[in-house]
Amino acid sequence: NVTELIGNTPLVELI
């Protein structure tokens, strides 16, 4: 799981 910070919203992406 890679957590990317987009703006102020933490989005969890499955890679």
Swiss-Prot record:
The gene is cysK. Pathway: Amino-acid biosynthesis; L-cysteine biosynthesis; L-cysteine from L-serine: step 2/2. Transmembrane segments: none annotated. It is an enzyme of class 2 (transferase). Belongs to the cysteine synthase/cystathionine beta-synthase family. Keywords: Amino-acid biosynthesis, Cysteine biosynthesis, Pyridoxal phosphate, Transferase. This is Cysteine synthase. One of its GO terms (molecular function) is cysteine synthase activity. It catalyses: O-acetyl-L-serine + hydrogen sulfide = L-cysteine + acetate. Homodimer. It comes from Clostridium pasteurianum. Its EC number is 2.5.1.47. Its cofactor is pyridoxal 5'-phosphate.
